[in-house]
Amino acid sequence: MIDGKKIALVLAESLKKEFSLLYDSCGVKAKMAVFCFNDDSASDIYIKAQSKLAGYLGVEYQLFKLNQEFDLSGLKQKFSDLNSDSDIDGVVVMQPLADSFDFRSLLLDMDPAKDIEGIHPINLGNLISSELTSISPTAAAVMNILNSCVDDYVGSEVVIIGHSHIVGKPLAMLLADKLTTVTLCNIGTSKVNRLEEHVRRADILVVAVGKPELVKGEWIKEGAIVVDVGINKVGSNIVGDVEFEEAKKRASYITPVPAGVGPITTVMLMKNLLLAFKKKHNTRV
């Protein structure tokens, strides 16, 4: 089993040293702004993790909790203010947003240099040309996990369930660059009842859909690497998208939920903030 907390602690310690060196060099702390709409259990967990890690790293963390009265024009104006605010190094927009908001339109108003989630069209487009600028923290976390498990990617059958711009799409491009054969599954795969078929042949399986135990343990190929990105609240329990107890009997490596991908994702977000801060101050410290 992969201990995400342990990996995250090691990475965070290294980041703390880098942020400290930058503070000594520049005399200012990195600062990030986070927008959150409505109450969402997964978002709340992530926000608490961000805030805690920011405190540990010496990063200034500003949270904007938006209510239903906050309209799109108001949020766009806030984005404009932050884009021109030289004190802000990174911006995060937590999803889900209000139904009335056009998320893509909102993204286009964000300064790509301050997009530390790697979701601005420019940053996503850079992945196609293998220019790794700001990468989705979740996709980066998955790659960090896989790099610790995989000796040779070439020719591996990779199956990714979920084609979001946060996980599935960027991860597919990153893994294709490793010369793997990537299958990207989505709701259409389930509609034609072919999900199990694809899962059964996966050497590497990544699941990120937000559906409790969607993937059954008995589907897992013997010796496969399983990365479960999902986080779902079922009663008083937090579970992933994979039927963990059965899957771990077949997988060579598997991430638990919680304490798997999540802690590393938060560190990767801060790594993107560090890179944005370095770029703004034109330093290699």
Task: Show which residues each predicted segment covers.
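Short, well-structured alpha-helical segments in soluble
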Residues: 74-86
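Rossmann-fold NAD(P)-binding glycine/threonine-rich loop
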Residues: 104-124, 230-281
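Short glycine-/small-residue-rich Rossmann-like dinucleotide-binding loops
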Residues: 96, 208-211, 230-231
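Positively charged, low-complexity intrinsically disordered leader regions
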Residues: 1-27
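Short beta-strand elements in bilobed, periplasmic/extracellular small-molecule ligand-binding domains
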Residues: 54-68, 182-185
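Short beta-strand segments enriched in small/hydrophobic residues
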Residues: 29-39
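Anion-binding alpha/beta catalytic cores of soluble intermediary-metabolism enzymes, centered on
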Residues: 92-153, 171
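Glycine-rich phosphate/diphosphate-binding loop of Rossmann-like nucleotide-binding domains
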Residues: 39-51, 133-225, 237-245
